[in-house]
Amino acid sequence: MDRKILMLVALVAAASATAQETYENARIATEDLNGTARYVGMGGALDALGADLSTIGTNPAGIGLFRHSQAKISFGFVSQQDARDFDNANKTNMSFDQVGFVYSMRNGRKSFVNFAFNYHKSTNFNQILSAANVLSGASQNKLSYLKGAGGLFSVGPNDKGDLVGDNNMFNSVDYLYYNAFLTTHDEDGVPSYGYNDATAYAFNRASSGYIGEYDFNISGNIDDRLYLGLTVGIHDVNYNGYSEYSENLVSSEGTPVGSVAIGDERIISGTGFNIKFGMIFRPIENSPFRIGISASTPTWYDLSTRSHTVLANNTDLGEYDSGTSDEAYDFKLYTPWKFGLSLGTTFGNYLAVGASYDYANYGKLDTRINDGGGYDWYY
């Protein structure tokens, strides 16, 4: 068989949301427990207790409980000593978690108006992830095959002679599989398609980067009973990940035929913003018991991604030993609304008790590819 090297360059991808991995979307949309030492030590259950800079991003009214101006800075470490060695990733990383200040102004005998700024690392992407297991009746190349056989797209040659799909459900991994592995041509050039099941897989991912959140807050209280706050947050996304996925393949008779591996390097960057509202009130005048309510708009992200994907065909099947794909596109990611309810009280000067409940329907996570053109395909 004539073995070749296959190359794909995707300049602007009018692709479906499947081009952006669900894992990475979920990591961008969710947050780590991070902030001041007090906030982390309380498990984040300070939304009703307030008077902590980290509540600026969860219940903005918490800043309204400050009576004096102050500044804080926090550091931390992320350690995965039990992780396997992969891609020269560090197992221990220092983390600059938080820095901020609050400026408090008295506005009457019992009322204050406060202004605050806080930076915190809402998500730390420094992580090594590994997984391996057996497979039965499944494989990644089979998934690409079934997408075409099931009618999600039709495959045919473009003017360069390489196989492409006819709609946005056809992504770069499908392209690599159809051109390098799934397709064979007879002597007359007529293509036929087939897949191979896998008996085992191995997956490794190393990622780095962060989402930095810059929060600007105005808050205050009325008669030391009702506390109100508003925060505008700006998010800065920096993600770099590299993953490798390999499968051991067998023929239809169960005979080993070799392996196929996919390596993917992806960079995501961009910004987002949201607005948060909060209220805390003391229903009993002489009691420290407090109830907190908060709401956050979606975080509206404008992001760009660039990826380089490599397929290594370590079998005698298909028509190419390897293939590469480079793509770049812009997309929007909108997180769902988030609502919070919290309770808190203190016992003297020695004990604080807090409880927080947050609700967000991540089934409403919205990803939209900026459709500015189409794929350009090259050998």
Model-based region annotation:
Residues M1-Y23:
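Bacterial Sec-dependent N-terminal signal peptides
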Residues A37, L49-T58, I63-S136, G209-G212:
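Outer-membrane beta-barrel translocator/receptor signature
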